[in-house]
């Protein structure tokens, strides 16, 4: 490969990379993850320690889908999206 071709690919990468990063950052969270399947979780022992935040309609962020589902057993909350809740 010639050095001109390598320079072209490098510059093209620098130009296009911010576009793809911005696209993924503004994608709606609902399109990235589905509503948690709460039938899988019945007790805290079912929950992993993996941080995958879930935002509920009460504006509370839950550690992951399992903790969201356990709270849903005792409170009338609904899933909003995967991620940390933000002020609206």
UniProtKB/Swiss-Prot annotation:
Glycans are attached at residue 37. InterPro entries: Kazal_dom, Kazal_dom_sf. It comes from the Eukaryota. CDD domains: KAZAL_FS. PROSITE patterns: KAZAL_1, KAZAL_2. GO terms for molecular function: serine-type endopeptidase inhibitor activity. Residues 32-87 form the Kazal-like domain. GO terms for cellular component: extracellular region. Residues 1-24 form the signal peptide. It is found in: Secreted. Probable serine protease inhibitor. This is Serine protease inhibitor Kazal-type 11.
